[in-house]
Amino acid sequence: MPSAIKGVMVQCDPSIKALILKIDSERHDIVIEELDETHLVIDSNKVQAVKNELNRLLSKNIYNPFDEQ
């Protein structure tokens, strides 16, 4: 019997897609399908977790000159 997974299509640039794929490589339960270089279908129940993890990863890569003072 076929089963279906409710998904959300995400459009992003290739660098963000790479981060989402990195997050998925640790859990293997987020990405349902890679459509092309800028589109993914992800599990609709994991959208908020992906947003939180992306924000965490991106905040580590932001340069703030005031942090050095």
Swiss-Prot record:
**Protein's job:** Component of the general transcription and DNA repair factor IIH (TFIIH) core complex, which is involved in general and transcription-coupled nucleotide excision repair (NER) of damaged DNA and, when complexed to TFIIK, in RNA transcription by RNA polymerase II. In NER, TFIIH acts by opening DNA around the lesion to allow the excision of the damaged oligonucleotide and its replacement by a new DNA fragment. In transcription, TFIIH has an essential role in transcription initiation.
Query: What is the protein's given name?
Result: General transcription and DNA repair factor IIH subunit TFB5
One GO term of the biological process aspect: nucleotide-excision repair, preincision complex assembly
Q: How does it assemble?
A: Component of the 7-subunit TFIIH core complex composed of XPB/SSL2, XPD/RAD3, SSL1, TFB1, TFB2, TFB4 and TFB5, which is active in NER. The core complex associates with the 3-subunit CTD-kinase module TFIIK composed of CCL1, KIN28 and TFB3 to form the 10-subunit holoenzyme (holo-TFIIH) active in transcription.
**Subcellular locations according to the entry:** Nucleus
Q: Which domain of life is it from?
A: Eukaryota
- Which GO terms of the cellular component aspect does the record hold? cytosol; transcription factor TFIIH core complex; transcription factor TFIIH holo complex
Endpoints of the signal sequence: none
Q: Which InterPro entries does the record cross-reference, listed alphabetically? A: TFB5-like_sf, TFIIH_TTDA/Tfb5
List keywords of the entry alphabetically.
Answer: DNA damage, DNA repair, Nucleus, Transcription, Transcription regulation
Query: What is the protein's species of origin?
Result: Debaryomyces hansenii (strain ATCC 36239 / CBS 767 / BCRC 21394 / JCM 1990 / NBRC 0083 / IGC 2968) (Yeast)
Family, per the entry?
Belongs to the TFB5 family.
